[in-house]
């Protein structure tokens, strides 16, 4: 089943399951870009001895179980299958017609309930107001976070920032005491969230929209110097400010008890594959040959703009090689126009079917090629439909002629390349 927003189906399924979501203590995150990063910062900082910190983020990067973690470790496959089979049986016997995402969301809630998580960090799948994760009662949400909002999924959420913001702000429901929003959002976005918070008596904290020497100031722990943390890209500073605003609220209200040193050390060890992620990609399982690449899941205009800022800072005007696949239905111009220059080369490819998301597939590379040529972004375009062949072909270019390689356009592309990489390492 494709994307179908609404809370009626999942509400009924959870009732048959005993409403596990009503026993969870939740931090709920919405936004267009940066949600997964904020969730990872939160779950990493909250981890303490004897604590179980659940995290639910989508889409998964490598395996579907990556979406559901406790202390950043995926749900065991057997446990996932057992819960999933029970849910599928309930879904069928009661003719509920739940979507794949609703079944996955229920799997996460049931798992977190069973292991008695102290905190559950929950990322919205799409939008917010009618997203399956919003079945969680407002009284169970200790805090909500709103990351940068941009144009994406317009056919579901609306064609303007204000319309999209209203959907995202829908996670702020009655009983939510505190909300944090990324201060770099457009004024009309912040106004929508501010009005929502005022109507529902949720106190709003707007993060600092300026870099200010890469510092984060908190009431609980004082200042943090972000220069000491492994953050790639300006936008990660603003994502971290959302997470820190939420954590600061929890600390002030004695919902957590974490020292400044603990916060710093846990942030220093955060890894987020697929977001400005540098790796030596193993392209050949026989020779163990590797190729340095930069991988980023940028898949919309605002994410592409942030990626370009990083690329110009790192590489200046140096020509780049892009390896790209794009999910079918995505707007091409907002994604490609900021990225490509006439000096750049692009290799267009595909990703395979995505586990648990049968409606997702890649845009035909020929369609993307025609668009790029029509727009005149670059004439250096190649198509390689077999993803596993793309990077080996680049490895045979001499180091003198080799350009920096940037893999982007879709998290599904990043995930599939990581699967190939991991299988080569195992072999």
Question: Where are these predicted regions, by residue range?
Answer:
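ATP-dependent carboxylate-amine ligase catalytic core
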Residues: 3, 7, 12-23, 47-139, ...
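A conserved segment at the C-terminal end of the G1
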Residues: 25-29, 37-54
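Beta-strand->loop->alpha-helix junctions that form or flank phosphate-binding loops
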Residues: 59, 179-185, 194-214, 230-233, ...
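Short glycine/serine- and small hydrophobic-enriched flexible loop segments
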Residues: 107-114, 245-252, 419
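Nucleotide phosphate-binding/pyrophosphate-handling subdomain across enzymes
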Residues: 119-124, 132-145, 150-153, 163, ...
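Conserved catalytic-core segment of NTP-binding enzymes
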Residues: 127-201, 332-334
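C-terminal helical cap/extension that packs against the catalytic core
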Residues: 183-204, 288-294, 336-404
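Active-site-proximal loop/hinge segments that shape catalytic or ion-binding/gating pockets
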Residues: 410
